[in-house]
Amino acid sequence: MPDSAEETISDMASVILSGTVLAFDFGVRRIGVAIGEYELRLAHPLMTIDQAMTKPRFEKIAELIETWQPVLLVVGLSVHADGAEHEITRLCQRFARRLEGRFGIPVVMEDERYTTAIARLTLEEVGITGRKQRPMLDQIAAQHILQTFFDSSHAAS
């Protein structure tokens, strides 16, 4: 992966003009996955990988990559509200490096602050509350991560 997020983002914006993009909301227990088309700039929740073990996670991701043939992967970067890194930040970065290394697809990190809270509110707006949110929460968070990427200036063609 390039040395800085800005370098990655500018490189991707100049190269990736069309195709499928997968986004991941990384968690220790679950990974939310969203999908979108670069040209349409519209993200959709896809699924939640509910597995803590690394091997089954990457097997499922390999299936998704084979099925959807993405041109870019976006991984949510978890940081504190003030932007400071924490343990999950390093795990997100490691996950992103593994994705790029295993699949050879460019990876961009996108700030994921507040995406879970936004996902929770989104589900509450349609009447899904409490424990009923669990199966969908991470994929909705991934959708918000991907939509933020599409809406940002660095994704503009």
Curated annotation (Swiss-Prot):
Could be a nuclease involved in processing of the 5'-end of pre-16S rRNA. GO terms for biological process: rRNA 5'-end processing. It comes from the Bacteria. GO terms for molecular function: nuclease activity. NCBIfam families: RNAse_H_YqgF. Belongs to the YqgF nuclease family. Its EC number is 3.1.-.-. This is Putative pre-16S rRNA nuclease. It is found in: Cytoplasm. Keywords: Cytoplasm, Hydrolase, Nuclease, Ribosome biogenesis. The keyword Nuclease applies. One of its GO terms (cellular component) is cytosol. Its main location: cytoplasm.
